[in-house]
């Protein structure tokens, strides 16, 4: 089984450096172009299944990547980005002034401190682990497209290849690229990270 991983296209929140977990943040013109280019790059891959975050920026990306393919998109809430609570759509400079104590605590211990009224890393990582546990449901598929977010995909890669959850920051998943992980019964192999080449099955 191969997972083809795609991060949603660029949003204005990405440009502005805002925390955007669950807040609605539509794709920019560049984000749309990134997804359309991925449609071209991955046109030769025969996807059996599409799994996507329930957030619109990811779903829009999935629709553009699939384009004219008649493939249903299965919405998976576990693929949603981390929820930043009161910090949604806010810049770190503002949080340093307006929620200084909690934001400082989170910066110093992001694994245990929790964004104000948001989702802590422990809950977030457990949610991604639930998705990993579900992968056995899809083992009869060959090529699965997964459309999600930076945090989720970084954590997913780390955990699938046997690294601890806190190692997720070793993997930056860029927009406008595709990555691939092969999974067999014993282990997973990161085959490709952040490629802008034409995708080829079984390569």
Swiss-Prot record:
Keyword NAD: no
Transmembrane segments: none
Reaction equations catalysed: adenosylcob(III)alamin 5'-phosphate + H2O = adenosylcob(III)alamin + phosphate; alpha-ribazole 5'-phosphate + H2O = alpha-ribazole + phosphate
EC number, as in UniProt: 3.1.3.73
Gene Ontology terms: cellular component: cytoplasm
Pfam families in the cross-refs: His_Phos_1
Active-site residues (renumbered): 8, 81
GO molecular function: alpha-ribazole phosphatase activity; phosphatase activity
InterPro entries: His_Pase_superF_clade-1 (IPR013078), His_PPase_superfam (IPR029033), PG/BPGM_mutase_AS (IPR001345), PGM_Phosphatase (IPR050275), Ribazole_CobC (IPR017578)
Keywords per UniProt: Cobalamin biosynthesis, Hydrolase
A biological-process GO annotation: cobalamin biosynthetic process
Coiled coil: none
Pathway named in the protein's UniProt entry: Nucleoside biosynthesis; alpha-ribazole biosynthesis; alpha-ribazole from 5,6-dimethylbenzimidazole: step 2/2
Enzyme class: hydrolase
Family under the similarity heading: Belongs to the phosphoglycerate mutase family.
PANTHER family: ADENOSYLCOBALAMIN_ALPHA-RIBAZOLE PHOSPHATASE, BROAD-SPECIFICITY PHOSPHATASE YOR283W-RELATED
Chain's role: Catalyzes the conversion of adenosylcobalamin 5'-phosphate to adenosylcobalamin (vitamin B12); involved in the assembly of the nucleotide loop of cobalamin. Also catalyzes the hydrolysis of the phospho group from alpha-ribazole 5'-phosphate to form alpha-ribazole.
Name used for this protein in its record: Adenosylcobalamin/alpha-ribazole phosphatase
């Amino acid at each position: 089984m191969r997972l083809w991983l795609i991060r949603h296209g660029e949003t204005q929140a990405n440009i502005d450096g805002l925390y955007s977990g669950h807040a609605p943040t539509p794709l920019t013109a560049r984000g749309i172009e990134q997804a359309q280019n991925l449609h071209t790059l991955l046109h030769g891959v025969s996807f059996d299944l599409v799994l996507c975050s329930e957030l619109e920026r990811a779903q829009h990306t999935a629709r553009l990547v699939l384009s004219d393919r008649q493939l249903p998109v299965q919405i998976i809430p576990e693929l949603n980005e981390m929820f930043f609570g009161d910090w949604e759509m806010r810049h770190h400079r503002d949080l340093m002034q307006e929620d200084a104590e909690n934001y400082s605590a989170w910066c110093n211990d992001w694994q245990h401190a929790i964004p104000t009224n948001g989702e802590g890393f422990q809950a977030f990582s457990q949610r991604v682990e639930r998705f990993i546990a579900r992968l056995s449901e899809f083992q009869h598929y060959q090529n699965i497209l997964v459309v999600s977010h930076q945090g989720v995909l970084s954590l997913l890669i780390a955990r699938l290849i046997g690294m601890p959850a806190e190692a997720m920051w070793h993997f930056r998943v860029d927009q406008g690229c595709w990555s691939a992980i092969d999974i067999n019964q014993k282990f997973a192999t990161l085959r490709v990270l952040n490629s802008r080449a034409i995708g080829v099955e079984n390569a």
